[in-house]
Amino acid sequence: VHFSDAERDAIAAIWGKIHIDEIGPQSLARVLIVYPWTQRYFSKFGDMSSVAAISGNPKVAAHGKVVLGALEKGVKNLDNVKATYSNLSQLHCEKLNVDPDNFRALGDCITIVVASKFGNAFTPELQNAWHKFLSVVAAALSSRYF
């Protein structure tokens, strides 16, 4: 996948404004709430019986930070995203048995949280580049499945 200079600039601009400690927990919590079947992958996280329980769960927050923090590797390696996430793809495929459709769902939730945080500053042009980036990351994470 080729990223244009404008797309690279947009992705860097978005990433430069993201606070992992805020966006990460909100994004993972949103996935677990909107797509409740994803909770099965996080059975060790304890109580996830309600929106409040998920949103206030410190293990969800901590893992959300890890998940979002892992995106930085992709941002820094736009020319080789697939190789960047090869080990994570293998882990999620062979050990964790995560349905690869969930990577797209997570990307959608990250985008929603980012859009709600940045409001009108999250222009269609920025969204287009960000969506392309997250789609490439989701494909890379799914690569060991196919």
From Swiss-Prot:
Disulfide linkage = none
Biological process according to GO: hydrogen peroxide catabolic process
Domain Globin residues, every copy: 2-146
> Is Iron one of the keywords?
yes
Q: One Gene Ontology cellular component annotation?
A: blood microparticle
- Any Pfam family: Globin
Q: Which domain of life is it from?
A: Eukaryota
MF terms in GO:
haptoglobin binding; heme binding; metal ion binding; organic acid binding; oxygen binding; oxygen carrier activity; peroxidase activity
Keywords of this entry: Heme, Iron, Metal-binding, Oxygen transport, Transport
| Tissue localization of expression | Red blood cells.
| Tagged with keyword Cytoplasm | no
In this chain, heme b is annotated as bound at 63, 92
The annotated subunit structure for this chain is:
Heterotetramer of two alpha chains and two beta chains.
Name the job this protein performs: Involved in oxygen transport from gills to the various peripheral tissues.
What the record says about family reads: Belongs to the globin family.
**Any further remarks?**
This fish has two hemoglobins: cathodic and anodic. The cathodic Hb and anodic Hb display small and large Bohr effects respectively. In addition, the cathodic Hb displays a reverse Bohr effect and appreciable phosphate effects.
Which named protein is this?
Answer: Hemoglobin cathodic subunit beta
